[in-house]
Regions:
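The feature encodes the CheY-like receiver
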Residues: 56, 83, 101
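Acidic, metal-coordinating helix/loop segments flanking the phosphotransfer/catalytic sites
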Residues: 31-48
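Active-site residues of response regulator receiver
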Residues: 52, 79
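Conserved acidic carboxylate
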Residues: 8
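Two-component/phosphorelay signaling modules centered on CheY-like receiver
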Residues: 11-30
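C-terminal output helix
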Residues: 85, 103-112, 116
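Acidic catalytic/metal-coordinating carboxylates
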Residues: 34, 59-62
Length: 121
């Protein structure tokens, strides 16, 4: 079972992504709308974290730094902010990958699997 923590405040993106991932075989998805919600789930074991950068209560990059103190699973950022500086900062602060919104679900799935595969090596 692949466990995913999806941190996304936009209900349409969250629901669509959650539905798509749950339709894949062997996926369990836990959804969080805010950074606070994500932190409440953070002690659980996840294989990958998908996280928006713009959250209502915190910046996803700052949240990533906090999560890195005890989580070593891949963190994939998703954001409509796709300028070079934002992407570089997200990766430098602990993110493993970045996917600009709107994203294709097949590409998202491929990125999830590639990041998990890299960790399992």
């Amino acid at each position: 079972m692949i466990r995913v923590l999806l941190v996304e405040d936009d209900p349409v993106i969250r629901d669509t992504t959650c539905y798509f991932l749950k339709s894949q075989q062997n996926f369990e998805v836990v959804c969080a709308e805010t950074g606070g919600d994500a932190l409440s789930h953070a002690r659980e074991k996840f294989d990958v974290i998908l996280m928006d950068i713009l959250l209502p209560d915190t910046n996803g990059v700052d949240l990533c730094q906090r999560l890195r103190s005890w989580h070593h699973c891949p963190i994939i950022f998703t954001s409509c902010l796709d300028d070079t500086d934002t992407i570089v900062r997200a990766l430098e602060m602990g993110g493993d990958d970045f996917l600009a919104k709107p994203y294709n679900n097949k590409i998202l799935l491929a990125r999830i699997m590639a990041n998990i595969r890299r960790v399992q090596m």
